[in-house]
């Protein structure tokens, strides 16, 4: 059995204890890498809005990562993509992206977009493996020294 075969992805409430733990790790990492004006993560309450879907990936009953899909006007935005450092390289990110893409397609979204940090190289590789390409700012984002923008047509 492969590591990916043991990963399940399920809808979750971002206000749950396990989601808060994952989001706390993610926010701490981003806050250690970038100044506040260049951090674009959503709060737990913002993630709980009706137009946002949230999932947790788990393996053997343990939360390993999370991701959110904000369904916006004409596109979907990937938010709060995070994989626990101990679980990286084991298919968790792929499982999360596949789940998110399935949902985006089922709701008729034509494109997925994201903003990520400039030095998060492993995230850039993951997104490229799944067909994302670099693009310019979108929505309310502006060009900045720490942002990389990517998108994928569905």
Kindly give the residue locations of the regions a language model identified.
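Charged, amphipathic alpha-helical coiled-coil/dimerization segments
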Residues: 90, 98, 102, 107, ...
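Helix-turn-helix
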Residues: 123
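Acetyl-CoA-dependent GNAT
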Residues: 5-79, 84-85, 97-99, 103, ...
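Ser/Thr-centric signal marking residues that sit
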Residues: 66, 94, 116
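Active-site acidic-Proline motif in GNAT/NAT acetyltransferases
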Residues: 84-90, 118
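Actinobacteria-biased recognition of intrinsically disordered, low-complexity terminal regions
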Residues: 1-2
């Amino acid at each position: 059995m492969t590591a990916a075969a043991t990963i399940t992805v399920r809808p979750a409430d971002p206000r749950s204890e396990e989601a808060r733990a994952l989001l706390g790790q993610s926010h701490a990492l981003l806050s250690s890498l970038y100044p506040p004006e260049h951090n674009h993560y959503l709060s737990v309450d913002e993630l709980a809005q009706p137009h946002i879907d949230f999932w947790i990936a788990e393996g053997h009953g343990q939360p390993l990562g999370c991701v959110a899909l904000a369904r916006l006007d004409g596109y979907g935005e990937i938010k709060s993509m995070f994989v626990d450092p101990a679980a990286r390289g084991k298919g968790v990110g792929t499982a999360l992206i596949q789940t998110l893409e399935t949902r985006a397609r089922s709701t008729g979204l034509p494109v997925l977009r994201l903003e990520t940090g400039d030095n998060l190289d492993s995230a850039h590789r993951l997104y490229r493996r799944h067909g994302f390409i670099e693009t310019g700012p979108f929505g309310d984002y502006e060009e900045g020294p720490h942002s990389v923008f990517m998108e994928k047509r569905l």
